[in-house]
């Protein structure tokens, strides 16, 4: 025992039982144990865990396995076990005090890390010696002390004399020991922390050992005195000491004196902690025990004192503690008893704090094990007095203190049996202060705003108050009044559970009696809030119907104001919600509240243009009603006729009076109720299927379904007519309009009979027609509505089997319209606002997402999937609705082209036109005065794609009219035909980008048309005529013509016949419109058109017949125009055309080309002979044969010219002609010779 242990070693109870004959370390106070898991409260070698307390209480051997040998070593000396205490008691206690002194001297040594190990071992050994001695005293009293008869006159042995004196000696020595060690509070400050060495062994300073040894001494003295009394069954008088009253000191008086001093010490320790470290807000989280050993000492005292009070006239623990605490609460020093307790700064607060924490120790049993189910002994009498003092302070009660007091009181209500008197005392205070906010200026009250927010939040507050476990942060989150409500709830619930309704009647009488008309009129807004909180809580824990009816009677005394009306409505609606949660009939409340709602809705409608203050107040009340009714529907297990009362014509009036933001709230309410009705209907259908054979259950479920239908009919009556009237309006938020319409459609599917007569006999189809297929509805509404509709597989399946065979085609039509009109909503915004914005960004993000979702769902329709499957066009990714529409148009065109039979083609044309509907109406908004670049671009691109992809369809007589209208509307509107008017730049840009699509499509139609259509050919010519010139570059650069839409149409055309037709038409337009020389007036923009022709000839396989049409104009330009650029371009054209003719005729001179030149010579040879020769020289350089074929014509033209002028031989002309002939080889030389011969003959 003298050696220092490496760590805290002890034997558990089970090991102690197994090793019955082995020495066990005696129990002692120790906080050196591992509690990282949080499960252990005391050390294994403590008085509780080791079973030492139990042995004392049950009067068992304190240490059955110790001190069994004949001798025992105490303080390093061997003693005879059975006689040592009798023979040498004073010596032993003297040695004990010496050891104490040795330990105290160790405190003077410095505790650095180098010395701590030695100091720890020394102090530990001293403590073990002292504790072992006191346990030896206990064991000696139990085993060896003999009870002698004091009246016996028989001679006794000297030992027996000493033995008889031992109890008095022990009282003397124990009293002297207590005087020597003094009070716990007088010990030097102790650091309860430990040093940890490299072996992870905890080493404690001497001060720690001294504190714990003092604790051991204080407790073991009590044990020894208790055992002495139990053993002797009589009072033991001291021989040396008297108590403070002058009486002889006895074991009983010493026990009581020491017990009182020890409790005073513990209170002082707690006081020191309370005054320095405890804030009111942290009172219950700040414990009063500096270490577990102090806590153990409290528990030991509780058990020991309560045990003694049961079997003797001694006082219980609570009486001891109450007696001491009362001295703290005395107002004058003269009235206080002479106890050694420091006066605290807050006696009331400290008393609440210490009582609450000490009460929690009652949960520990004799082994130190917590047992929450254990019945705890209460101390209500003292707490009642404490509570009265707490709320009757004359100087005024501080809220921050009151919260702490009541929080402690609430905790005690958890521990102890219910006490109605507590509620009565508190109610007397709060009934007088209902108008107080119970707030703390420096602490924001979280709960107040939370409570006032809504009826549901008021109920949540009540539920919080009724919870069995309260938040530790209650001080900061709730007022003292709220904590009072928690106390009220807990006490009433517990009392009614134990004693039936009688406690409730007591409480009800006390509370109801405080409210009458005058008191109700005195309540402020805060007072009303507290009033509702109180009665809602009473309704929650007791008779809700009785409380609610009483509250309504009390409210009739009030005349609501603008400030109090919202609160009154919230409170009333909170009772309605409580009825619903408790599954009670809400009929009476629903009738009363819905009538009030109707009246307020009527006022709201009338006050539409009145001042905003009154309107805002009315809207607040109406919002409270809607929020509460929504909550009623969402929390009701099933609907009853009384639910229909909540939906009256007040909503019809309200809807007409609402502005946009207010409408959002009403429609949110509507959607929530619709969703709840459908959910309940689905549950009923499932239950009907499960209970197919049980007629009684089926009858009950059918009744519930009728109730559902009645509520649904009310919604149709009071909401739908307004929604229907707002289909084309922008007052109602479009997304909510679509959502509400979709919900009504699903309701029509579930309960078709509830729909109004104008939607019958097929309400679902009628609804979709109104909100999904009608072309006058905003596309934002349609897209969102159809997305809801297509997501519901049951609805789609029902439509498929309802005879509505066109529902897929009509849905596709609406989808096309939604895409084409995606920019319509932005037409009111100036177009320059979107200069730097991507077109997709010009569309609302929500709408683009909705279009994407609609596209995804649409591509799942069987009809659409079938089209893509037949066309073998891959289904596009729906992330880009515009690209998806283009792919759809292409897929339809390819599918039609793959059809073989006439009937299939005719049906496909009909279906395709059904997809388009009045498509020109969809794009009409973009073609008005308000310009949208993105909208025009979208329109022209989509329609161009349609014209090209559906060219074969437009070739049919059924579809050709639509094609004509498209061309007239988009490419040949009146503004285009009026040459003096410039087209808007965005429109011109859109046409330029999409014109190739139209031209190619029109050419295909012309080639494939079932009947020769002169009008269509004329349209094609008109389009080319209008846009060739509009898109010619300002300067005649051939490089700039590469992107001319007319040329692009030729480049990108995959089929030869349409390209040939298009080129032929282009050539005719150029010849007609740009090569008409009227007198001296030259055709406009000759250079640009020549550049265009040059590009045309270079990039296409120009036919000789087309060159035959263009070449005269080019020759005229060379002949008649002197502008250098025109001459250069005309020369290049001439060269290209000659080369093209060479290629086309296989190297032989083309007859058509020769014919063109011959006619040119005949027309202009008389006047422009020199220019003609110059032109032909250029031609001869490319193709001599062409010019050789023209020699006879040229010679004849020369002769005719000479004859006309009548001047004989024209030498200059002949010389120019000879120059040309000299370039023609032998044929030219022969002709020169022939002309010379003719001249000679004429001379002769």
Curated annotation (Swiss-Prot):
Subcellular localization, as worded in the UniProt entry: Nucleus; Chromosome
InterPro entries in the record: MMS22-like (IPR042320), MMS22L_C (IPR029424), MMS22L_N (IPR029425)
Gene Ontology terms, MF aspect: single-stranded DNA binding
A Gene Ontology BP annotation from the UniProt entry: replication fork processing
GO terms for cellular component: nuclear replication fork; site of DNA damage
Family label: Belongs to the MMS22 family. MMS22L subfamily.
Quaternary structure note: Component of the MMS22L-TONSL complex, a complex at least composed of MMS22L and TONSL/NFKBIL2. Interacts with RAD51; interaction is direct.
Stated name of the protein: Protein MMS22-like
Gene name, Swiss-Prot/TrEMBL: MMS22L
């Amino acid at each position: 025992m003298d050696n220092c242990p490496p760590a805290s070693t002890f034997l558990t109870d089970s090991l102690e039982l197994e090793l019955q004959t082995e020495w066990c370390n005696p129990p002692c106070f120790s906080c050196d144990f591992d509690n990282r898991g949080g499960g252990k409260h005391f050390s294994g070698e403590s008085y509780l865990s080791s079973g030492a307390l139990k042995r004392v209480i049950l009067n068992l051997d304190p240490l059955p396995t110790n001190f069994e040998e004949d001798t025992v070593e105490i303080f390093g000396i061997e003693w005879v076990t059975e006689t040592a205490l009798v023979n040498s008691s004073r010596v032993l206690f003297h040695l004990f005090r010496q050891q104490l002194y040795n330990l105290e001297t160790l405190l003077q040594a410095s505790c650095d890390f180098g010395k701590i190990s030695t100091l720890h071992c020394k102090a530990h050994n001293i403590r073990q010696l002292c504790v072992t001695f006191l346990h030896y005293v206990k064991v000696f009293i139990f085993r060896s002390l003999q009870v002698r008869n004091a009246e016996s006159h028989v001679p006794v042995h000297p030992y027996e004399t000493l033995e008889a004196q031992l109890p008095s000696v022990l009282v003397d020595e124990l009293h002297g020991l207590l005087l020597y060690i003094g009070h716990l509070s007088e010990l030097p400050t102790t650091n309860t922390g430990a040093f940890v060495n490299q072996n992870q062994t905890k080493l404690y300073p001497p001060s720690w050992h001294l504190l714990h040894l003092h604790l051991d001494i204080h407790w073991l003295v009590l044990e020894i005195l208790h055992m002495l009394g139990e053993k002797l069954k009589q009072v033991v008088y001291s021989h040396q000491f008297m108590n403070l009253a002058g009486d002889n000191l006895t074991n009983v008086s010493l026990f009581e004196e020491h017990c009182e001093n020890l409790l005073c010490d513990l209170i002082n320790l707690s006081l020191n902690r309370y005054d320095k470290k405890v804030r009111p807000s942290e009172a219950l989280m700040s414990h009063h025990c500096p270490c577990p050993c102090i806590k153990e000492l409290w528990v030991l005292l509780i058990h020991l004192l309560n045990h003694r009070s049961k079997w003797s006239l001694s006082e219980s623990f609570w009486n001891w503690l109450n007696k001491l605490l009362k001295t703290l609460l005395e107002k004058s020093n003269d009235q206080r008893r002479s106890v050694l307790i420091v006066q605290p700064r807050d006696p009331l607060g400290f008393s609440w704090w210490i009582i609450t924490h000490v009460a929690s120790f009652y949960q520990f049993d004799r082994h130190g094990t917590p047992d929450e189910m254990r019945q705890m002994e209460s101390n209500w009498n003292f707490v009642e007095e404490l509570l009265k003092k707490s709320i009757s302070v004359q100087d005024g009660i501080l809220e921050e203190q009151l919260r702490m007091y009541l929080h402690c009181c609430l905790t005690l209500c958890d521990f102890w049996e219910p006490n109605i008197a507590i509620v009565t005392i508190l109610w007397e205070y709060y009934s007088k202060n209902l108008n107080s906010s119970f707030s703390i200026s420096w602490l924001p009250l979280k709960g107040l705003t939370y409570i006032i927010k809504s009826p549901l939040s008021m109920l949540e507050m009540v539920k919080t108050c009724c919870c069995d476990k309260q938040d530790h942060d209650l001080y900061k989150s709730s007022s003292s009044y709220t904590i009072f409500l928690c106390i009220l709830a807990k006490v009433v619930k517990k009392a009614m559970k134990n004693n039936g309704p009688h406690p409730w009647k007591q409480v009800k009488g006390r509370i109801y009696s405080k409210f009458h008309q005058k008191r109700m009129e005195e309540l402020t807004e805060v007072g009303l809030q507290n009033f509702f909180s109180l009665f809602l809580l009473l309704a929650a824990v007791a008779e809700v119907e009785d409380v609610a009816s009483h509250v309504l009677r009390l409210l009739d005394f009030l005349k609501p104001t603008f400030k109090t009306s919202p609160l009154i409505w919230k409170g009333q609606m909170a009772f309605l919600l409580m009825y619903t949660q408790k599954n009670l009939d809400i009929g009476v409340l629903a009738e009363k509240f819905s009538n009030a709602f109707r009246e307020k809705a009527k006022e709201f409608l009338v006050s539409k243009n009145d001042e905003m203050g009154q309107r805002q107040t009315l809207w607040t009340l109406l919002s409270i009603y809607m929020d509460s009714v929504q909550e009623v529907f969402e929390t009701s297990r099933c609907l009853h006729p009384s639910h229909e009362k909540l939906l009256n014509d007040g909503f019809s009036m309200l809807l007409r009076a609402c502005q946009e933001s207010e409408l959002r709230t009403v429609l949110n309410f509507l959607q929530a109720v619709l969703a709840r009705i459908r959910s309940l209907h689905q549950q009923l259908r499932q239950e009907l299927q499960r209970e197919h054979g049980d007629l009684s259950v089926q009858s009950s479920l059918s009744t519930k379904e009728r109730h559902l239908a009645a509520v649904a009919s009310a919604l149709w009556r009071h909401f739908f007519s307004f929604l229907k009237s707002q289909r084309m309006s922008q007052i109602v938020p479009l997304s909510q309009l679509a959502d509400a319409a979709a919900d009504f459609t699903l309701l029509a599917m579930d309960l078709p009979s509830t729909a109004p007569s104008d939607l019958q006999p097929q309400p679902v189809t009628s609804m979709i027609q109104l909100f999904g297929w009608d072309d006058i509805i905003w596309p934002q509404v349609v897209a969102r509505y159809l997305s809801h509709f297509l997501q519901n597989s049951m609805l789609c399946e029902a439509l498929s089997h309802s005879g509505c065979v066109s529902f897929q085609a009509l849905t596709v039509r609406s989808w096309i319209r939604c895409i084409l009109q995606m920019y319509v909503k932005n037409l009111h915004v100036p177009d320059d606002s979107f200069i730097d914005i991507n077109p997709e960004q010009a569309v609302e993000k929500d709408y683009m997402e909705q279009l994407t979702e609609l596209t995804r769902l649409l591509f799942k329709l069987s009809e659409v999937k079938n089209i893509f499957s037949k066309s073998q066009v891959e289904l596009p990714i729906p992330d880009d609705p515009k690209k998806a529409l283009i792919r759809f148009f292409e897929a339809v065109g390819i599918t039609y082209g793959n059809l073989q039979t006439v009937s299939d083609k005719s049906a496909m044309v009909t279906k395709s036109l059904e997809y388009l509907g009045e498509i020109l109406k969809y794009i009409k908004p973009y073609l008005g005065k308000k310009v949208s670049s993105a909208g025009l671009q979208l329109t022209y691109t989509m329609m161009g794609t349609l014209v090209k992809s559906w060219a074969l369809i437009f070739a049919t007589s059924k579809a050709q009219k639509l094609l004509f209208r498209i061309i007239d509307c988009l490419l040949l509107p009146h503004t285009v035909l009026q040459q003096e008017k410039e087209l808007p730049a965005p429109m011109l840009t859109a046409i330029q980008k999409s014109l190739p699509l139209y031209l190619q499509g029109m050419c295909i139609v012309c080639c494939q048309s079932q009947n020769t259509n002169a009008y269509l050919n004329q349209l094609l010519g008109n389009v080319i005529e209008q846009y060739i010139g509009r898109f010619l570059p300002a300067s005649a650069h051939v490089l700039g013509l590469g992107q001319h839409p007319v040329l692009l149409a030729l480049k990108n055309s995959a089929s030869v016949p349409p390209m040939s037709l298009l080129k032929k038409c282009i050539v005719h337009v150029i010849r007609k419109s740009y090569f008409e020389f009227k007198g001296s007036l030259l055709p406009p923009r000759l250079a640009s058109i020549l550049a265009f022709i040059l590009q045309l000839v270079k990039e296409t396989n120009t036919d000789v017949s087309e060159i035959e049409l263009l070449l005269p104009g080019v020759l005229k330009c060379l002949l008649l125009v002197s502008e250098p650029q025109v001459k250069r371009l005309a020369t290049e054209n001439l060269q290209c055309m000659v080369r093209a003719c060479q290629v086309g005729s296989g190297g032989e001179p083309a007859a058509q080309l020769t014919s063109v030149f011959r006619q040119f010579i005949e027309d202009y040879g008389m006047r422009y002979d020199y220019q003609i020769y110059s032109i032909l020289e250029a031609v001869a350089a490319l193709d001599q044969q062409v010019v050789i074929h023209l020699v006879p014509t040229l010679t004849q033209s020369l002769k005719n010219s000479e004859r006309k002028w009548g001047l004989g031989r024209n030498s200059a002309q002949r010389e120019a002609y000879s120059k040309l002939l000299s370039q023609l080889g032998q044929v030219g030389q022969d002709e020169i010779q022939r002309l010379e011969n003719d001249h000679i003959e004429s001379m002769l």
